[in-house]
Curated annotation (Swiss-Prot):
Pathway(s) of this molecule: Amino-acid biosynthesis; L-isoleucine biosynthesis; L-isoleucine from 2-oxobutanoate: step 3/4; Amino-acid biosynthesis; L-valine biosynthesis; L-valine from pyruvate: step 3/4
Entry superkingdom: Bacteria
Residues that coordinate or bind [2Fe-2S] cluster: 123, 192
Keywords: 2Fe-2S, Amino-acid biosynthesis, Branched-chain amino acid biosynthesis, Iron, Iron-sulfur, Lyase, Magnesium, Metal-binding
Organism from which the protein derives: Bacteroides thetaiotaomicron (strain ATCC 29148 / DSM 2079 / JCM 5827 / CCUG 10774 / NCTC 10582 / VPI-5482 / E50)
Protein name per its UniProtKB record: Dihydroxy-acid dehydratase
InterPro entries: Dihydro-acid_dehy_C, DihydroxyA_deHydtase, DiOHA_6PGluconate_deHydtase_CS, ILV_EDD_C, ILV_EDD_N, IlvD/EDD_N
Disulfide bonds: none
Catalytic activity: (2R)-2,3-dihydroxy-3-methylbutanoate = 3-methyl-2-oxobutanoate + H2O; (2R,3R)-2,3-dihydroxy-3-methylpentanoate = (S)-3-methyl-2-oxopentanoate + H2O
Binding site for Mg(2+): 82, 124-125, 489
Length: 600
């Protein structure tokens, strides 16, 4: 049954003459009146290398859409660079920006009654923020990301942003070596080149089904990235017509992002050792979609999903461009499907089932298409380059080695345990998260005395100042969603632990969170957080912390009675919190619920 266009409220009828005059002043032609108005939700900014190249691409998408008879209108969201905001109070704003992005998209699309969306995202909070908005709005939507940065190279070794951060705090590394790494770590536009939060989310968007194959892995500089944008433009017109002309609701975000799709996405995340931030974001997106998806589901999946892909920061051997050469996200999904670990009946935004997509896009499938082979042959250009789609390098040979290559089959998994795990215990009754793919197996069981800090800044000073020694468990409290507020990423403390050559000799736990660039025994999202009365806020220096990843437990060696009787440790830090962040703190949930806003 035909659906009424949302935009008809401002384009149809005599009394809408004023609105039509304004649409005409925006460039709408008479023959576009009464056709779907498609919002191009861009996120261009010159503050973020993952978005610096998106300035003109929105207009390319607009031109492609308008060739097909619809009207397209572009607007922008904010975008914060977590790497630049890291290590100072700017990081307090990062996670809250996710909700502002979601709100701004909802505001613009609903205020102007757009009928469909193309979401051009890329970096850490932008993709989940736009996904949250897509679930709220539930209109035809296609996602296409700006693509990953190429890996840097120095002295024949691949490197990235995290190398620059670690080496700069290592006194044994010369100033010249640090300068060389700095100059080569981030050679192109795009989101940082490892399986950090941005790339993790763009990869998961393929598994959720709202993005096309290659979305998460084709480098930003490659000509095939531009083709993805062109394909997204054509697809959104097709899907808008399916919905409004034919009443086909299968193209709607909530029809695609079902519970099974979220389970598939989380299974992929565990299999590829993605960022722990994805746990927060998938929980939040599912909340907006009205899908029953919780920490217990993640725990369940983590116990049966092996690690099939290791990429920086979990190894320096591979970066995202290597995942693309091995067949991209579809290749990992294909291996998971062989083991019955995902549901391949789910539908995708391109109209195919996941099973059909695997058949056409898996590079080991006998039915793989030429288009798929071209996508996954997209190579790095290996030169400094800030222009989207400006190079055409192709691999001559793809990585189909599932025994020793970048992507493994189930028989040759990197580990039987997946890349993420949920731990529970008297420190974290509601759970906490660790990226096991980044933890050396020698410290999967770890016991040591606590060294407690009530801020990221104090922890950094303690680590660099020698207060933290081999065998310690660094505990950073009052950095959760409420306590920060804003749930800062602890990338600098974890990097400094490595700089001090303690990466296999210390652990870190916090009610804050971690960058996707973090590795090591780093346990975050402790819930309930200290600011909500959680037991992490009662730990004092010298308390013995016991971590057991195989058993999925984390405890302080105190009885329930001792913990109940112990008061919360006073907060000694001096931190200015502006009203905007106080407002966020007043309604944000705990990390185990995705740090979503709780509004009656």
């Amino acid at each position: 049954m035909k659906k009424q266009l949302r935009s008809s409220f401002s384009t149809q009828g005599r009394r809408m003459a004023g609105a039509r005059a304004l649409w005409a002043a925006n460039g709408m032609k008479k023959n576009q009146m009464g056709k779907p108005i498609i919002a191009i939700v861009n996120s261009f900014t010159q503050f973020v290398p993952g978005h610096v190249h998106l300035h003109e691409i929105g207009q390319l998408v607009k031109a492609e859409i308008e060739k097909l008879g619809c009207f397209a209108a572009e607007f922008n969201t904010i975008a914060i660079d977590d790497g630049i905001a890291m290590g100072h109070d700017g990081m307090l704003y990062s996670l809250p920006s996710r909700d502002i992005i979601a709100d701004s998209v909802e505001y613009m699309v609903n205020a102007h009654k757009a009928d469909a969306m193309v979401c051009i995202s890329n970096c850490d909070k932008i993709t989940p923020g736009m996904l949250m908005a897509a679930m709220r709005l539930n209109i035809p939507t296609v996602f296409v990301s700006g693509g990953p940065m190429e890996a840097g190279e120095w002295n024949g070794q691949h490197l990235d942003l995290i190398d620059a951060m670690i080496k700069s705090a290592d006194d044994s590394v010369s100033d010249q070596e640090v300068a060389n790494i700095e100059q080569n770590a981030c050679p192109t536009c795009g989101c940082c080149s490892g399986m950090f939060t941005a790339n993790s989310m763009n990869c998961l968007n393929e598994a959720i089904g709202l993005a096309l194959p290659g979305n998460g892995t084709i480098v930003a500089t490659h000509e095939n990235r531009t083709k993805l944008f062109e394909d997204a433009a054509k697809l959104i017109v097709e899907n808008a017509m399916k919905y409004y002309e034919e009443g086909d609701e299968s193209v709607l975000p909530r029809s695609i992002a079902t519970r099974q799709a979220f389970l598939n996405a989380m299974t992929l995340d565990i299999a590829m050792g993605g960022s722990t931030n994805t746990v927060l974001h998938l929980l939040a997106v599912a909340h907006e979609a009205g899908v029953d998806f919780k920490m217990d589901d993640i725990d369940m999946l983590s116990r049966k999903t092996p690690c099939l892909c290791k990429v920086a920061p979990n190894t320096q051997k591979y970066h995202i461009q290597d995942v693309n050469r091995a067949g991209g996200i579809i290749a990992i999904l294909a291996e998971l499907a062989k083991g019955g670990l995902i549901d391949t009946s789910v539908l995708r935004v391109d109209g195919m089932s996941l099973a059909e997509a695997i058949d056409q896009y898996s590079i080991t499938s006998p039915n793989v298409t030429e288009k798929a082979m071209s996508k996954y042959s997209s190579a790095a250009g290996n030169r400094f380059n800030l222009v989207l789609g400006s190079q055409g390098a192709y691999y001559q040979e793809l990585d189909k080695d599932r025994a020793n290559g970048c992507i493994r089959d189930l028989e040759h998994a990197y580990s039987k345990d997946g890349g993420l795990a949920v731990l529970k215990g008297n420190i974290a009754q509601d759970g906490c998260v660790v990226k096991t793919a980044g933890v050396d197996e020698s410290i999967w069981k770890f016991t040591g005395p606590a060294k407690v800090f009530d801020s990221q800044e104090a922890a950094c000073e303690g680590i660099l100042g020698g207060r933290v020694v081999s065998g310690d468990v660094v505990v950073i409290t009052h950095e959760g969603p409420k306590g920060g507020p804003g749930m800062q990423e602890m990338l600098y403390p974890t990097s400094y632990i490595k700089s001090r050559h303690l990466g296999k000799e210390c652990a870190l736990i916090t009610d804050g969170r971690f960058s996707g660039g973090t590795s090591g025994l780093s346990i975050g999202h402790v819930s309930p957080e200290a600011a909500a009365g959680g037991n992490i806020g009662k730990i004092v220096d010298g308390d013995i912390i016991e971590i057991d990843i195989p058993a999925r437990t984390i405890n302080v060696r105190l009885t329930d009675e001792e913990l109940a009787a112990r008061p919360m440790t006073p907060v000694t830090r001096d931190r200015y919190v502006p009203k905007s962040l106080k407002a966020y703190a007043s309604m944000v949930s705990s990390a185990d619920k995705g740090a979503v806003r709780l509004i009656d």
